[in-house]
Amino acid sequence: MPPKKGGDGIKPPPIIGRFGTSLKIGIVGLPNVGKSTFFNVLTNSQASAENFPFCTIDPNESRVPVPDERFDFLCQYHKPASKIPAFLNVVDIAGLVKGAHNGQGLGNAFLSHISACDGIFHLTRAFEDDDITHVEGSVDPIRDIEIIHEELQLKDEEMIGPILDKLEKVAVRGGDKKLKPEYDIMCKVKSWVIDQKKPVRFYHDWNDKEIEVLNKHLFLTSKPMVYLVNLSEKDYIRKKNKWLIKIKEWVDKYDPGALVIPFSGALELKLQELSAEERQKYLEANMTQSALPKIIKAGFAALQLEYFFTAGPDEVRAWTIRKGTKAPQAAGKIHTDFEKGFIMAEVMKYEDFKDEGSENAVKAAGKYRQQGRNYIVEDGDIIFFKFNTPQQPKKK
């Protein structure tokens, strides 16, 4: 079957943020809400987790493998010499405090660390513990969430003024017509962020030109958020906490579409200290499970990332791409020659491969597709690329 011609792909929505696939998600919250403990269990590292504010000053960064039953199945099937999963880059950022945008606490340094990330795990505390002090004096996750939102919002407002002043000087008073469109776009951003007090990401109709300007400045409120609610072990196991419904209602109202994921740092820490057999027995006895796989997958998806597989006896590998990536660019993740000489992508859906039992069976069932350069790669595709090898220049 020849590869499909143009028009076999749907134009994806524009994505706000840095281009590329080596994106980072930062753990953000007030001091002493459990950020470093969460980072430790997530990355299996031992970043300092002491009970005092600003314990983490330089952000700790780690790569976390993305759990995926599809990847595990392909490894079991092929028994490859090399196994390379997808990874999520996670950064533990020191606690923000009220007034951070004005330099309170270690404010501006922390905000710059957030700016260097592409998404946010917004971690809030919903457990009581007299041994762990709260910087605001009491446990109130709604108040804490609002403090973080306000600090990010105020920092963006602070950024917009100088950008507009510079553009006005050059584009309006200086008559530089090339910069006039950017000035007009920044006026729209100012209206949305400063006048209407709304985060950049809440406006869903930014056009391509506006996205280009937003990507130039990387405003803090443009970054996607996943809300993580740190519960006591008891509350997490019984699936009850007085704050959870209130947090979900707040997020649905003020950050619609964002995920809220409850977890227990204390439970995750305990599970990590048990052997695999003891861990399984404990989870079964308490009819619960770790929240970490769900959190990792949610962070990966929030960054608009996905992956396709190459699979065989030599290697099973997950190749990370941005959502909406076309086949030639996906091929280029493996090697630039694959993109330059792209002919076609031979694609199997993971579900078809698992159901049919082999590549030959997928072909026999008519489910093995040859796709052209307009094909938009889908998450979990198993792909074999065909390409022309670039010719070497002839020696004279």
From Swiss-Prot:
Keyword tags: Acetylation, ATP-binding, Cytoplasm, Hydrolase, Magnesium, Metal-binding, Nucleotide-binding, Nucleus
Coiled-coil regions listed: none
GO term, biological process aspect, one: ATP metabolic process
Start and end residues of each OBG-type G domain: 23-283
Residues where N6-acetyllysine is found: K294
Cofactor: Mg(2+)
Motif (Nuclear export signal): 267-274
Residues bound to ATP: N32, V33, G34, K35, S36, T37, L231
Domain TGS, chain residue ranges per copy: 304-387
GO molecular function list: ATP binding; ATP hydrolysis activity; GTP binding; metal ion binding; ribosomal large subunit binding
Function noted in UniProt: Hydrolyzes ATP, and can also hydrolyze GTP with lower efficiency. Has lower affinity for GTP.
Subunit structure: Monomer.
UniProt similarity note: Belongs to the TRAFAC class OBG-HflX-like GTPase superfamily. OBG GTPase family. YchF/OLA1 subfamily.
Classification via NCBIfam families: redox-regulated ATPase YchF
Protein name in the entry: Obg-like ATPase 1
Organism listed in the record: Mus musculus
Gene name for this UniProt entry: Ola1
